[in-house]
Amino acid sequence: MYAWLNALPKAELHLHLEGSLEPELLFALAERNKVALPWPDVESLRKAYAFNNLQEFLDLYYQGANVLRTEQDFYDLTWAYLRKCKEQNVVHTEPFFDPQTHTDRGIPFETVLSGIGQALEDGRKRLGIGSGLILSFLRHLSEEEAHKTLDQALPFRHAFIAVGLDSSEKGHPPRKFRQVFERARAEGFATVAHAGEEGPPEYIWEALDLLKVKRIDHGVRAAEDPRLLERLIDEQIPLTVCPLSNVKLRVFKDMSEHNILKLLEMGVKVTVNSDDPAYFGGYVTENFVALQESLGMTCEQAERLAQNSLDARLA
């Protein structure tokens, strides 16, 4: 079944580039940039990946991102991910990157963007992988900080297809970023947002009504609100679901409890994605395999999920 699922043409619509930083590359970049790490070797770092919730993961994620310093680093990070896409027949990807994670460390915005952008361009030319980059605001920071990031991005507007919202969800509702999203839309960007992962269904309503998003990232807690489900089905608003991530971060205790196939059968436009694959134990194919092994996903369901991802592209 792995080979068949791997060969299925699919798009990935929920992937954080910084979250695809594998331990081996992290160590190589640390050595290249002479960055001291708190782990003595790759194995120790892998063991540190046994976190229990979103905040513990984010603490590790931001520590790992600290090794990314130069344009070449960002190129190497993105290229490693694109090679994995090629291996798994991901024909199109719309990755997120978090400029604030890097600009707050003194890395120039254009350094980050140049490295990522060049790799995506090479991915199109050399690997045949379509792509569109999404600039994501960090929700644990202020809306004022998000406005500054948008200011930095505007001279490079051609490089992005959308703006998004990620990081710690609890206590940071979408309404906090209403004005910056309004401004981004006025500048011609599509909008997406993480909502309904650890946060309540109300956050999904806010993302739809206040941020006017085209897609909801995660969104699994929509199942708690029948009226919201009805709207998602009626308007065919895609959810970019990340099964392995959800289990690793305890959104579901076990993959056997995941609701993605129930949502699919209800008519919700759900898609399968890897989120932060270096940290969550698998890329897109591994997420499909987990659904097949734990939920008995059929070939027909897998084909529908893959087609949903291709249909839900912004670029």
UniProtKB/Swiss-Prot annotation:
Give the EC number(s) listed in the UniProt record.
Answer: 3.5.4.2
UniProt xrefs under InterPro entries = A_deaminase_dom, ADE, Ado/ade_deaminase, Metal_Hydrolase
Asked if the keyword Metal-binding belongs to this entry, the reply reads yes
Q: Pfam families from the entry?
A: A_deaminase
Q: Which GO terms describe its cellular component?
A: cytosol
Gene3D superfamilies assigned: Metal-dependent hydrolases
Entry cofactors: Zn(2+)
**Similarity annotation:** Belongs to the metallo-dependent hydrolases superfamily. Adenosine and AMP deaminases family. Adenine deaminase type 2 subfamily.
Protein name per UniProt = Adenine deaminase
